[in-house]
């Protein structure tokens, strides 16, 4: 029993230490993304199609958080791992540490009626030291938060740029269509004026009480005087948008978009139901339990040895 107790103590001190830090994450509250939502409202008001809400931001956060390769890359650049060893040993250590990270959805599909009124995930990391486990979990969460902020803002700016490019091309095309239509209208008015003068129609036909089936291509119902005045007005327009409110509105919106600048707004892509904890109890059986189990095993083996010895003597 004494030998077993000694061996148990040696084993208890030789076993690797394992400490697990945990964090519980949820969809961010409105106030945590208020700056971002204000920018999105401005952009949507100018006709930019932005699909995104707090849930989408949180899902992007979880997606990036769950990436083993991203966690390994962060470990290499974070200074948390001793990079003075050879590359093979370093790679093995990083892979081992990456396997200690777990991301679990707290929703239980077997208990659909007992689900929480919000979505939450539990993130945990197991390290060889208390402070190390908490520090790595904190550092990785901060890194992912930074990556999500960067991607969300880049996506927002990219959507604005695409809308501006599409708006410019659409306006240019519509301007060409309107200019062609105006040129054709002016040419038709010239022909109509010639026809009206040739027919001796100077005043509008309806003012003379006449019912005439007008030519759809070269209308003369206004009379030469009316056609000449209309031709004068159409020819005096320097821009096709002068009498086109739709075109003017689109140009105004485009100018507002071009003047819009999205700053690097700060927002929280995740809400912490539980911040990364400092583990107070190491994983696995404690030294006292190992000692008790070792003594019990030693006692059983000792009793078995004595009984077997007596049986052989008998």
Question: Across the structure, where does each feature detected by a protein language model lie?
Answer:
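Soluble periplasmic/extracytoplasmic beta-strand elements of cell-envelope proteins
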Residues: 20-26, 120-126, 269-275
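Soluble oligomerization/assembly scaffold segments of membrane-associated complexes
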Residues: 75-258
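Hydrophobic membrane-insertion alpha-helices, especially the h-region
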Residues: 1-12
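Short coil/turn motifs at secondary-structure junctions
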Residues: 28-30, 130, 300
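Interfacial amphipathic helix/helix-coil modules
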Residues: 252-299
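Extracytoplasmic
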Residues: 15-115, 183
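Juxtamembrane interface at the cytosolic side of transmembrane helices
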Residues: 1, 17, 283-290, 298-314
